[in-house]
């Protein structure tokens, strides 16, 4: 049986293609260089079995999502991801599971052009923790605190598919492949995020639900907003669900969307439309910022059902 160091070397010591990395996996710490006019942006997310994914989810899907959700955080800051570390807690040494996990993670890292530079392994309940690092030009990072009165509120993509998938699975109903992919293989908006620099006044990735995540922007910016529930971008699957359930709480509060919600001055409407077309990403105006210090959701009477970690 492999020991910890053999496991790391066999499954995760991949060839490095980024010349900025001097030391990666295998030393006490990583060593890399960044340009003098850049700032480092870093974020950490943990995915736990039974909380963030079901026990029967494929190891390749777990690997992909673990990286994708971290990339989404970096994109929300307008940064470009460069490096990541992996901390893997395993209940047992399952070489077939590890092989599938490693291959998928390597494939995803190559696709998104981000390099694994270190990490750790230990024994325990299945947990995957990734810390990701990106770079952004100094003073250009998009924060949550920049929204201004009169700004328009936008969101990328569609909302509610991942939540619908979870709902169906919890009810013992097999979801269609479209919503299942939205849950297991979210697409981080790594091109949209950096493109929003000088356009977005504030930005956040929608991980815990639009209502809750937009509220983070409002609190950080000390503003309020009016959100139009009829403007929410919804897939055919979610629209079909709403026809019978009228459950607007699902797309508003469901979470796991990993889309970008951002605010922008009205003068940027034409630029945002061009971005949507050039990146082939649906970008929808869903509301307006005001000075009320509250969030009013027109057409929705329900209470918050956004994801709570505790």
Predicted regions, residues:
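Extreme N-terminal cap/leader segments of soluble proteins
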Residues: 1-58, 77, 82, 86
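Glycine-/charge-enriched secondary-structure boundary and capping motifs
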Residues: 2-13, 91-115, 122, 126, ...
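General beta-strand structural signal in soluble alpha/beta enzymes
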Residues: 24, 41-43, 115-119, 154-157, ...
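Residue-level signal for inorganic ion chemistry
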Residues: 31, 70, 78, 116, ...
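Glycine-rich anion-binding loops of enzyme active sites
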Residues: 34, 40, 47, 80-168, ...
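Small-aliphatic-rich amphipathic alpha-helix that forms the alpha element of a beta-alpha
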Residues: 59-83, 100-111, 189-191, 195, ...
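Internal active-site segments that recognize and position negatively charged phosphoryl groups
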Residues: 148, 153-157, 186-210
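A short, charged helix-loop
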Residues: 165, 171-187
């Amino acid at each position: 049986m492999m020991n910890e160091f053999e496991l790391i070397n066999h499954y995760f010591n991949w060839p490095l293609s980024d010349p900025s990395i001097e030391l990666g996996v295998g030393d006490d710490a990583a060593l890399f260089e960044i340009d003098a006019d850049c700032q480092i942006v870093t974020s950490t997310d943990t995915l736990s079995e039974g909380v963030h994914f079901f026990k029967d989810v494929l190891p390749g899907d777990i690997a992909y999502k673990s990286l994708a959700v971290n990339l989404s955080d970096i994109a929300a800051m307008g940064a470009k991801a460069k490096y990541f570390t992996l901390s893997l807690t395993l209940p047992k040494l399952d070489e077939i599971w590890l092989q599938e996990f490693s291959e998928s993670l390597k494939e995803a890292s190559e696709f998104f052009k981000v390099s694994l530079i270190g990490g750790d392994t230990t024994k325990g309940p299945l947990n995957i923790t990734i810390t990701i690092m990106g770079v952004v030009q100094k003073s250009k990072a998009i924060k949550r605190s920049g929204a201004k009165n009169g700004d328009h509120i936008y969101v990328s993509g569609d909302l509610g598919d991942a939540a619908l998938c979870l709902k169906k699975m919890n009810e013992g109903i097999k979801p269609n492949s479209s919503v299942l992919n939205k849950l297991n293989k979210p697409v981080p908006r790594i091109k949209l995020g950096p493109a929003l620099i000088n356009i977005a006044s504030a930005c956040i990735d929608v991980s815990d639900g639009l209502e809750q995540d937009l509220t983070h922007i409002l609190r950080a910016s000390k503003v309020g907003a009016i959100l139009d529930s009829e403007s929410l971008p919804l897939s055919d699957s979610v629209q079909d669900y709403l026809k019978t359930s009228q459950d607007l709480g699902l797309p508003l509060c469901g979470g796991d969307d990993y889309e970008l919600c951002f605010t922008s001055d009205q003068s940027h409407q034409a630029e945002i439309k061009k971005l949507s077309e050039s990146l082939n990403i649906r970008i929808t105006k869903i509301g307006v910022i005001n000075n009320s210090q509250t969030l009013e959701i027109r057409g929705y009477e329900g209470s918050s059902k956004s994801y709570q970690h505790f």
